[in-house]
């Protein structure tokens, strides 16, 4: 049985833009919602943080106004962001994302005598993104002159339409409480590994103080 000590956090917002209002060139209408919940596991097996988000852009807009994944291009890890997605790699007008973070709170390391004295803690993460681009916003399927062609570099596209049946997935294994301050994790990309110019693996850091 999970022990749910924390009430879920719910958030929803709607963002609108009007053409010719304060210099706006396009109408856009975006709706997003998210929920976050923490689950405590029995027998001191740690906790799981779960976050789910979903959103839609309802209007016809050029690609800079489409929904871009929360890509983190730095070496500093940030919660609920994607460490190995390039900026503007996927362009969606409908999306859903999920982030799971499992903090074992030293359950494994405490069984290893030498490691136990260091008081390191282990953490596992999985992040996934589902997305699609409707035909009205797809410049390859629409003749609307207001839509921009996707960006390119050296003659190759750098932005792509996701397969709605194939989510983007990345996972990581991390150690925190190093010197009571440092968090280090290894990140691996599981899907869309053939996209040009991507990193399939990486090392990320974070300053994380645990009390």
Please report, for each region that a protein language model flagged, where it lies by residue.
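Exposed, low-structure sequence patches enriched in small/polar residues
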Residues: 1-211
């Amino acid at each position: 049985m999970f022990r749910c000590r924390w009430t879920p956090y719910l958030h929803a917002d709607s963002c609108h833009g009007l053409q010719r209002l304060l210099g706006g060139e396009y109408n856009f209408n975006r709706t997003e919602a998210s929920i976050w919940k923490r689950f405590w596991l029995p027998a001191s097996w740690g906790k799981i943080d779960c976050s789910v988000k979903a959103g839609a852009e309802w209007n016809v807009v050029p690609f800079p106004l489409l929904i871009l994944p929360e890509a983190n291009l730095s070496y500093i890890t940030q919660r609920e962001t994607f460490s190995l997605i390039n900026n503007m790699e996927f362009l969606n007008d409908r999306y859903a994302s999920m982030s799971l973070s499992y903090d074992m709170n030293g359950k494994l390391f405490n069984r290893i005598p030498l490691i136990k004295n260091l008081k390191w803690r282990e953490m596992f993460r999985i992040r996934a993104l589902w997305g699609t681009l409707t035909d009205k916003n797809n410049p390859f399927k629409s003749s609307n002159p207001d839509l921009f062609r996707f960006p390119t570099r050296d003659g190759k596209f750098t932005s792509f339409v996701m397969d709605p049946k194939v989510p983007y997935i990345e996972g990581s294994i991390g150690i925190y409480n190093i010197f009571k301050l440092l968090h280090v994790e290894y990140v691996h990309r599981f899907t869309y590994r053939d996209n040009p110019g991507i990193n399939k693996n990486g090392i990320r850091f974070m300053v994380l103080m645990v009390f």
